[in-house]
């Protein structure tokens, strides 16, 4: 796993997650647990849980990056 660890994500910061070739950009709205967060997609403004993005597994390209 490259990039940031789930435990280092912070509320109000913007991130890019890459998994199985899909790219998602989101902002963390609140912490739900030690490794789960409520997030808002920056492109569609949809709200969902971060775990929903990798609930089917983490690919070889799994990476979380902070964006500005």
What are these regions (language model features)?
Residues 8, 28-30, 55, 65:
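Short, exposed beta-strand/loop patches in secreted or surface proteins that constitute
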Residues 20-50:
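Basic/aromatic-rich interaction segments and small domains that mediate binding to polyanionic partners
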């Amino acid at each position: 796993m490259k990039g940031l660890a789930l435990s280092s994500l912070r509320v109000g910061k913007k991130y890019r997650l890459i998994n199985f070739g899909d790219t998602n950009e989101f902002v963390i709205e609140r912490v739900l647990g030690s490794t789960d967060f409520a997030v808002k997609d920056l492109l569609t403004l949809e709200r969902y849980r971060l775990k929903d993005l990798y609930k089917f597994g983490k690919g070889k390209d799994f990476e979380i990056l902070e964006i500005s």
